[in-house]
Amino acid sequence: NQDPSVTIRLHNRSVSRKIALNPRLAVGEAYMDGSLTVEDGGSIYDFLDLTGSNLHVLDALTIVRIRNWLSGWTRPLQQHNPLGVARKNVAHHYDLSDDLFDLFLDSDRQYSCGYFDSQNSTLEQAQKAKKRHLASKLILDKPGLKTLDIGSGWGGLGIYLHQETGANVTGLTLSKEQQKYAEKRTQDLQIQGDVRFLLQDYRRETNLYDRIVSVGMFEHVGIKHYGEFFNKVGSLL
């Protein structure tokens, strides 16, 4: 019944300071670049499991309490998300090389979590199951329903909804690369009249829709803009 233990090695002095200041980011980056390693036959999973079971101890530390207080005070400023800032944030994250995203996404470039209904599901199967699950929740029970996809990414969900249900889909994205890629897909599939993707902030949309879906985009809205988001969605239905 010995208490669990994990041995980690920090390979330079700056790592401990970075972890103390921003553990959520610094631990992952240190493990990724090799400046934090797990020793004596342990794994990163052992380390995370042990850390998770001791969060109450960490939260009691003075430095952690100060950091949490500062984080809570500055979070509204960090998440201030007016139109111009939103566009720059999206460009920084998504307007990158296609080759990069193809390295780790499924063939449909779904960027949100898959729906793993089996331990043996592949990434492709999980992402298709997610799209099927979303379509079911939207109750697209007749062709031609006008459907808005806020944060439409590379277009996979919108195209799937049209192909499976006959929905008329408009997707909104702030990424030039995503919009260009998604529009090319509609051209290749010859469905431009039924599915379109616009380079536009959802706050500028004025058309009315039968259904609205937004997957994995809400984290970009910002706490101060939650009410604005739901009010806008309500006005478009």
Identify the function of each model-found stretch.
Residues N1-Q127, H133, L140:
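Feature captures hydrophobic
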Residues G227-L237:
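A short glycine-rich, Lys/Arg-flanked "PGG" loop and its adjoining helix->strand segment in the class I
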Residues W154-G166:
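Conserved SAM-binding loop of SAM-dependent methyltransferases across substrates and taxa
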Residues P143-G151:
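Conserved class I S-adenosyl-L-methionine
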Residues V213-F218:
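A conserved beta-strand element that flanks and buttresses the S-adenosyl-L-methionine
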Residues L189-Y202:
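Conserved SAM-binding strand-loop segment of SAM-dependent methyltransferases
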Residues A182-E183:
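Conserved SAM-binding loop
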Residues R203-I212:
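A short acidic, Gly/Pro-enriched loop at the edge of an enzyme's catalytic core
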